[in-house]
From Swiss-Prot:
One GO MF term attached to the UniProt entry: exodeoxyribonuclease VII activity
UniProt lineage: Bacteria, Bacillati, Bacillota, Bacilli, Bacillales
Gene name linked to the record: xseB
Keywords: Cytoplasm, Exonuclease, Hydrolase, Nuclease
SUPFAM superfamilies: XseB-like
Function comment: Bidirectionally degrades single-stranded DNA into large acid-insoluble oligonucleotides, which are then degraded further into small acid-soluble oligonucleotides.
Broad class of where this protein is predominantly found: cytoplasm
Residues that span the membrane, as ranges: none
Organism: Listeria innocua serovar 6a (strain ATCC BAA-680 / CLIP 11262)
EC class name: hydrolase
Its EC number(s): 3.1.11.6
Family affiliation: Belongs to the XseB family.
Protein name, per record: Exodeoxyribonuclease 7 small subunit
Catalytic reaction list: Exonucleolytic cleavage in either 5'- to 3'- or 3'- to 5'-direction to yield nucleoside 5'-phosphates
Subcellular location: Cytoplasm
A Pfam family of this chain: Exonuc_VII_S
Amino acid sequence: MATKKKTFEEAIAELETIVEALENGSASLEDSLDMYQKGIELTKLCQDKLQSAEQRMAKVVTEAGEEIPFEADGE
């Protein structure tokens, strides 16, 4: 069975659910560790998707002849 790749929005929604569950503090240590690990995986997925979108946008802007540098907040 093929697994469907998560969209950015699906990953963010799942990450928000995990954060709420961890903040609640009612999960066992083992469940909390599993959720934390899944959260790290989702964070990486979101970062990769954002980086890919940024590269696509930069390519489109460059092809249009209006190169605009991207600046990351807080860096």
